[in-house]
Amino acid sequence: MFGVVESMKKETDDKNYKKRFVKGLKLLCGSKSTYQVWSDCIALFAITLANQSILPMTKFEQFKEVWDKREKEYLRIINNYSKKEQKLFPQMFALIVEELEERPNQDLLGELYMMLQISNDNAGQFFTPYVVCEMMSKLTLDRKELGKTVHRKGYANVYDCACGAGATLISESEQCKEMFKKYNYQNHVYFVGQDIDITCVHMCYIQLSLHGLAGYVIHDNSLIKPEPKLPEDIEKIWFTPMWFTDVWTMRRFFHSQDVLGR
């Protein structure tokens, strides 16, 4: 395994980040299923981003409790792997970041999930191809109404009740980027996803965070709770780093979270 870790370091000139990520993932599948390793990998990435994001909020007891629980979950997962295997995870996370930096307009994690052929292992999930999400966003996003909402309130939100890995939200954000060419859309539109599958929540959260989008992803059943309101149990909510920037913090100061979450 150590030799493999070294070989991955030597592949830094190889721009095929997806291939290198899949290679690293499969190296961890000795005694574990591909789905288990994928879920662990994604959970570690999500917790790393989330706990860093809410760290300034840990002065409040409810956020401190969530931070502690996620930190314990991180340690529980990572301790299932050897010291040598643990060295692969930050390298794989870096590959995800590099891929999205070069080609942001894609559903990277959803594509990898389907590429690894692990969807059938988890309730037969199938993620809509990103090109289809792009077409749907272009056809359904009411730019005029969105513009009016932003002009009237200063912000608008986009909600996906079954977000999967976040393809629809990402494609909607690309439409917003084209629409608000005179403004930074990241300061005027926030994105909310919801899914019953925690691995999907993690995937969507990672991608929204790395795309620099303000918002959050809720781990809950959309059939029972279809409205995108912030639940009282904040452990179910995964806030993106942009959600805590000064712009959105001030908006929450002037508008209650209950109103902002509608």
Language model features with spans:
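Class I S-adenosyl-L-methionine
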Residues: 2-180
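Generic alpha-helical secondary structure signal
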Residues: 21, 25, 78, 117, ...
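Conserved S-adenosyl-L-methionine
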Residues: 132-238
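SAM/dcSAM-binding transferase cores
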Residues: 229-262
